[in-house]
Swiss-Prot record:
An MF annotation (GO) of this entry: SNARE binding
Region named Zinc finger-like: 248-273
Domain WW: 5-39
Pfam families: Gelsolin, Sec23_BS, Sec23_helical, Sec23_trunk, WW, zf-Sec23_Sec24
GO annotations of cellular component type: COPII vesicle coat; endoplasmic reticulum exit site; endoplasmic reticulum membrane; Golgi membrane
PANTHER family to which the protein is assigned, alphabetical: SEC24-RELATED PROTEIN, SECRETORY 24AB, ISOFORM A
Protein name in the entry: Protein transport protein SEC24
Family: Belongs to the SEC23/SEC24 family. SEC24 subfamily.
Amino acid sequence: MSQPIMLPQGWEARWDPQANAYIYVDQSTGRSQWEVPLNPTFPTSPTPHAPPQRHGRRAYPSAMYAHAYDTPAPHVGPPQPVAGYAEQGTPQFITPGFEGQQPVQQPPYAAVDHVAGQFQQMNIAPGAAPVAGAAAGAYQGAGYAEKQLHSTKTKTVNLIGLQPDVAALDNPPPPALLPANASVTSSAHSQPDPSYQRCTLNAMPTTQSLLNKSKLPLALVMAPYRSIRETDNDPDVPVVEDGVIARCRRCRAYINPFVTFIEGGNRWKCCMCGLSNEVPQLFDWDQRAEKPADRWARKELNHAVVEFVAPTEYMVRPPQPPVYAFVIDVSSAAIQSGMVAVAARTILESLDSLPNADNRTKVAIIAVSTSLHFFSLPADATEAGMLVVPDLTDVFLPKPVDLLVNLTESRPAIESLLAKLSDMFQDSHTVGSALGSGLQAAHQLIGKIGGKIIALGASLPTIGEGVLKARDDPKLLGTSKESQLLNAGNNWYKTFAIECSKNQVSVDMFLFSGTYTDVATLGCLPRYTAGQTYLYPGFNASRSEDAIKFATEFGKVLAMPIGLEAVIRVRASRGIRMSAFHGNFFIRSTDLLALPVVPQDQNYVIELQIEDDIKGSFVVIQTAVLHTTCYGERRIRVITQAMPTTDSIAELYTSADQIALATYLANKAVERSMSHSLDDARNHVTNRLGEMLTVYKNQVTSAAGGASAQLAVPENLLLLPLLCCALTKHVGLREGASIPPDLRAYAQCLLTTLPCQTLIPYIHPRFYSLHNMPPEAGTIGGDDGAMILPPALNLTSEKLERHGLFLIEDGQNIFLWVGHDAVPRLIQDVFDLASYHELQGGKYTLPRLDNPFSERVCNVVDKTREMRRGVYRPQVYVVKSDAEPALRSWALSLLVEDRMDRMSSYAQYLTTVKSKVNGS
């Protein structure tokens, strides 16, 4: 039997059933903590062993080639410090306040090139076991609270000389260590899954001055309309269907797991403003069974994420039907690229997938070139009639009826039109596009109802409304004026977008041009109407890879169960207010976000401020999304998150979420690149990181006031510097005069809309070795029966081998890197070719061959394509190690730990940050 814990005088231990652990309370002050209040002992950290150093060029004995790719990699332990970063025997963990007792010798950082050279000579084996495919965001499933691990103290890590453990990017955020009995039930679902909502801090500072002093950002990161995936074992969102919605009379918060019942259960106390409210009469009544119900089983008291079916008082009009207006560019460029044919075929094949359960869905189709082509689709017709409007200055509808029609009633005419739409304009040699006028016509069609305009453009709008000019001046690229190309070139689009938002109209843009399209300007429409932008540069439907990618993504967009006519409002405990908003929406008032359509898996970031000092032991933040489902039901999705309060900077840093911080910094950097310059945006990321680590060094460790050879970070922020380094090298922000403005603008669209699960690999790609992956990789296994992926490698070219096959992916593209000494058997088994020289680089459709290795490689590629939420289907590019420079450079640019053009390596980036921390 274990010995009882002896506590110091004045302390007592209280059992916390939610945490399944004791919490220790100082009775004199009321202060509580998770660690045992004893005189601490500080065990010596184990001495890390540096890997054997290798000198000069690596030799590749030819005898090894024949079996290199099918020999499984040996089991390796956790990542070790890279030789050349720190001397062997350097302890990497620091106990705050005691690092003075742990002397560390560091290489002289004036010799940056020498350190970088040592880094490049290393070839460290991956330090992670094979992971199941669902592990990328594995914590994003049900019962997140059950998976939380309670940290008892801050661990400080010295980053200098430590190879980043990239597998830790999938770790859950630090837990919110709430006081005992903060929740009225013991449900494991009382806190939201991080894929719905997370905060940059999981402990709330009690004052704004403390927050300012910490230099930590305070922001919510949310994707409230997250998709439900069976492959991730996602549970459905619980729905309260009895019409009983308990709300606070003062702050209008919804009842949730963190309220308190008082006066014998007849009233409940709001956890945000403290007001006492009556419990609704039917709250404890089962209306279906007509008998008393168990209050503690109610969904809103057990689940942080819940939906209420809204009664009529939540409606200003009957729920709108789903409405889709397609505006299709039929100019010569669009026809010749094959875009029109693929788009029409995809719409035709998706008619059964469009949300139309109650047969209310409406559809309109408008073709645009130098004129507007409307199509009459009567309910009793089998053929469509075309009406041409050449007047583009004063757009009007040529017919009052049959242009916007019921999908079910006019199905024959719609199918007939889509089947021959491309052929109708096949002989057109029209150059120019009246896309702006087409958008205006679509708005006139659906503006009285609301809905979604889906615009497909293959050339720059050159006539009619919203004319744009080619402004991609190469002289501006790489200069401080490049930010001009990231802002709208014509205010008409923003004005039109705001008008659309007022009428509950959203716009999605699909852009295909092989030349400049001005994504920055056209992207204004989705940005202010809660839509999304999709770019297909150099699209050519004769390449099956292009056609399949567009058809797949377009089909998923059409089948998406969207929300309609929505508003989002975030409420928080007294003293906290929302100060800034980032994402695709229109800010209708100081705290109300208007979204004509709520697409799945779109991310939003909301900055918070502390107006008044916070007195309670914990705070609650609640997001409410009032929307109409595409099935005609008005609902409120409510997401409630609670976190403890603290007056300790050390606890703030221990609670910080590096994934949420990286997401916040990405949004702020994009905002700054548009308002200032790209250089300023990159500096902003690095400076914010430096400020945070400076405060951590000075306030949490004992190294305050002096220069240090170490770069101390809390263990939970171990990978934040790597993510910041990767962000500054991302195509949306990085330095260089060779990045087309459209690609940069599109990358910024993704940086501000992708949910965390997809954004992090977009910033920090995944890197796998396939030729020697463990035998279980590429097969079904694990407790959840998921596809097992190879161990993730660090993003450095030092991992590449001349005889190897590697996969690099960022969620948008997949690169298969083939070494020029790859053995013929590998080429034969994967590509069905006799030798490396027969292999062609570029976009590629990987064959599934009749051999085990091909099967496993294809499984890894397939799993990579579908492992994350969203509509995107990454294209596969084969990159030969001696390939054309542009493709090779593109793939290598994803290896963010390497030096890139004038941008520093990760080791050098840490040196820069350390200099900022030391004030030099």
